[in-house]
Amino acid sequence: MRKWMTSLLLTLLALPASAEQQKTIKDIEVHYSAFNSTFLTPKVASSYQLTRNGYTAILNISVLDRASLGKPATEAKLTGHAKNLIGNLRELSFKQVKEGNAIYYLAEVPISNEEMLTFDIDVDAGLKGAGKLTFSQKFYTEQ
């Protein structure tokens, strides 16, 4: 189960490879992806206590230590919000998931059909790096 979830999360991180959904901040690399929660199987969503429906997106962030051999995952503090085009804010609450050497931060975000959200996230990995991650993405609901 854990290997399957790790594979799924790595796949989701790799999906937008052409878009390079990552940001370098000092000695850390922040990788991110956002997707409709229906991409998760019911079993995986349940095991991580994630809501699985067509009106919830999952934000997945991993932070890697660029200064260490092999760029291992590193812990970070993440805070932030998502804002839609009319300025409504949705605070993000991140759950840390550790699987072997991997560390993921997951947040759930309610979405509406064809809604454009701008994410503003503060990433703090201590002396390794701290800064802001900002990106926008359009979401589509599933019935």
Q: Which residue ranges define each predicted feature?
A:
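Sec/Tat signal peptide C-region and signal peptidase I cleavage site
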Residues: 13-19
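Sec-dependent N-terminal signal peptides
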Residues: 4-13
